[in-house]
Each structure stands twice: as structure tokens, then as C-alpha cells.
Swiss-Prot record:
Organism of this sequence: Dechloromonas aromatica (strain RCB)
Classification lineage: Bacteria, Pseudomonadati, Pseudomonadota, Betaproteobacteria, Rhodocyclales
Known role: Nucleoside triphosphate pyrophosphatase that hydrolyzes dTTP and UTP. May have a dual role in cell division arrest and in preventing the incorporation of modified nucleotides into cellular nucleic acids.
InterPro entries, alphabetized: ITPase-like_fam, Maf-like
Official protein name in the record: dTTP/UTP pyrophosphatase
Reactions that this protein is recorded to catalyse: dTTP + H2O = dTMP + diphosphate + H(+); UTP + H2O = UMP + diphosphate + H(+)
Length: 201
């Protein structure tokens, strides 16, 4: 049994492969941000937990629309959304290098929460699960931030860092799911898939 992954993220593809799930990718419009038909702008007063659920569910629904428009075989559509919460504020992907550096300076020496919501749309019904992790950074100096931003790694990632990459050097403590911080919590995703008859591994 195969599913569709509604994401451009190479990390999510890698993690699905890791747990033995067969999938095809349904991508969004070329030349635009991933998930371009999904409004990722936080609503006024929207809490981070509600935000990540809304966006993950919307991505799954939009992925299903792509499947229908292309007249592809009907299968479950999996999507995910990752965001950071710092002092109650939603922190998404940086808009440019200056923004990435500013985000990293804020996170330096602090603890933040990483929320990843996973949604699977199947037969008109959406199942959802949330992974919540706390990450503590050591103090990061300006030179380290400059070098890291120049590497380009922060630019497509919520919170301006990838824990599986060079930013692993900044992580002093992690409480939660490493793969959830990467963008797809494999334990929670596996449990969600089992409800639909998939057998990870």
C-alpha cells in the first residue's frame, strides 16, 4: 500500500523511507514556496498548537485536490507542518539571511518548543497527531551565526536551523522527538499510519 506525500521536504522523504513506507510525492506549483496554496500566515491571536494543526490539515486537503485534479489513483495523502514557539510567538522560516541571523540570536542560550503536526487525509477524513519537543541552545556567538547563515542551511527551515545538520552543534539539550524536530516524528507518524492499515518496517 502506497501513499502520497504532500511536501517538497527532502527530510520528510528521507524519514518516510527510513520507516519503510512506499510513497509518491505530490508537489505544489513550481517556482513558488512549498505548499503555495496553503495560507501559512498565522491568524490574529492564533496559538502555535492551533496554527500547526490548521496548516498541516490544510496541506493534506490541498494534496488531495492535486491528486483529484491529476486523476491519480486515490490513496492516503500525508502532510506535515513544523513551527517553533518561543515565548509564545510563532517562528517560521526566515525570509532572508538577516532574518535567519536575527532568529538565531534570539534562540541563543534559550529553550524553545518545536511543534510538528502530521495529517493524513484518507477517504475524505483527516487523522492528525502532534509532536512537541523542547530544544535548548547553548550560547552562540555572532561569528558562528554568520558562518551558519552563509552556509545556506537555515533558509528553508522553521526557526532557521536544521537539527540534523550543522546546527546540531548548537543543541545543548533535547526533550522530545529528534525526528519531530527534523520535520516528521517517525514514532507518531508510524502509529497514525497503522490506524490506516499501513505496516511500517
Amino acid at each position: 500500500m502506497r501513499l502520497y506525500l504532500a511536501s517538497r521536504s527532502p527530510r520528510r522523504r528521507e524519514l518516510l523511507n527510513q520507516i519503510g513506507i512506499d510513497f509518491d510525492t505530490v508537489v505544489f506549483r513550481d517556482g513558488m514556496r512549498a505548499d503555495s496554496e496553503t495560507d501559512e500566515t498565522p491568524l490574529p491571536g492564533e496559538k502555535p498548537v492551533a496554527y500547526v494543526e490548521r496548516v498541516a490539515r490544510a496541506k493534506a486537503i490541498h494534496g488531495l485536490k492535486i491528486v483529484e485534479e491529476r486523476k491519480l489513483p486515490m490513496r492516503p495523502v500525508l502532510s506535515a507542518d513544523t513551527t517553533l514557539e518561543f515565548n509564545g510567538e510563532i517562528i517560521g522560516k526566515p525570509v532572508d539571511r538577516a532574518d535567519a541571523a536575527a532568529i538565531l540570536r534570539r534562540l541563543s542560550g534559550q529553550t524553545h518548543r518545536v511543534l510538528t503536526g502530521v495529517a493524513i487525509n484518507h477517504m475524505g477524513h483527516t487523522e492528525y497527531v502532534l509532536s512537541s519537543s523542547e530544544v535548548t541552545f547553548r550560547e552562540i556567538d555572532d561569528e558562528e551565526i554568520r558562518h551558519y547563515v552563509m552556509s545556506g542551511e537555515p533558509m528553508d527551515k522553521a526557526g532557521a536551523y536544521g537539527i540534523q545538520g550543522r546546527a546540531g552543534l548548537f543543541v545543548k539539550h533535547l526533550a522530545g522527538s529528534f525526528t519531530g524536530v527534523m520535520g516528521l516524528p517517525v514514532c507518531e507518524t508510524g502509529e497514525l499510519l497503522k490506524r490506516l492499515g499501513f505496516r511500517p518496517l
